[in-house]
Design a protein with these regions (language model features):
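Cytochrome P450 catalytic domain signature, combining two hallmark sequence patches
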Residues: 56-60, 179-190
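Second-shell residues forming the walls of enzyme active-site clefts
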Residues: 148
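Conserved catalytic alpha/beta cores of large enzymes that bind or transform nucleotide phosphates
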Residues: 151-175, 185-197
Length: 197
């Protein structure tokens, strides 16, 4: 919290512009398919386009009567080969990276230290894990190439290096050790995913 982490502001600016271009290209494709411009972030408008105009699938509604446009619904429709929901998912992903990370991290750079200072919350989770906020530096994406680019914006001081560590299944590992559950310890030592056993 006090020391902060150094970020490459120029790299973040470049990323934001890159994401902006990608978003614009995806929007053009979405509008071409829908044959009109609309607010892609509006689930109401998106639902009207998907179910009423394009008739991509039989009408799906939520319990409250709204059009179903959740990620799982879009993934299901995209899996069935429909390009429109695939583009919407891609648009959401890139928009999230831009708004939550490349733009937001720049806003969190302290003008005096030139670093990002997060706040660690010691009692915010029921599992005892730390939580991070303003900004959350514990959920930096890594699954996609664009997400990995966000991580590249974190840099070390000259002559130093940054390392990344992940406490894989930490709560279960502590349980196995404290309770001395031999089968569980063996599963971890054998690199097994205990949730698939």
């Amino acid at each position: 919290e006090i020391q902060g982490v150094k970020v490459d502001n120029k790299f973040l600016s470049i990323l934001s512009k890159k994401f902006e271009k990608k978003i614009s290209l995806i929007e053009d494709k979405i509008y071409k398919i829908s044959k009109k411009k609309f607010n892609i972030a509006s689930t109401k408008q998106l639902g009207e386009i998907m179910y009423e105009d394009l008739k991509i699938a039989s009408l799906k509604k939520t319990k409250k009567g709204s059009f179903a446009t959740s990620a799982s619904v879009l993934e299901d429709l995209a899996f069935k080969g429909n390009q429109f929901p695939k583009l919407v998912l891609e648009w959401r992903q890139i928009s999230k990276l831009k708004n939550t990370y490349s733009d937001s991290l720049q806003e969190h750079i302290n003008p005096k230290t030139k670093r990002v200072h997060t706040s660690f919350l010691l009692a915010a989770t029921t599992t005892g894990r730390l939580a991070s906020s303003d900004p959350n530096l514990q959920n930096i994406p890594i699954k996609t190439e664009d997400g990995k680019d966000i991580r590249k914006s974190f840099v070390s001081e000259k002559g130093n290096i940054l390392i990344s560590a992940d406490y894989n299944q930490i709560e279960m590992r502590i349980l196995a050790d404290l309770a001395d559950v031999k089968e569980l310890k063996k599963a971890f030592n054998d690199q097994q995913d205990i949730h698939s056993l």
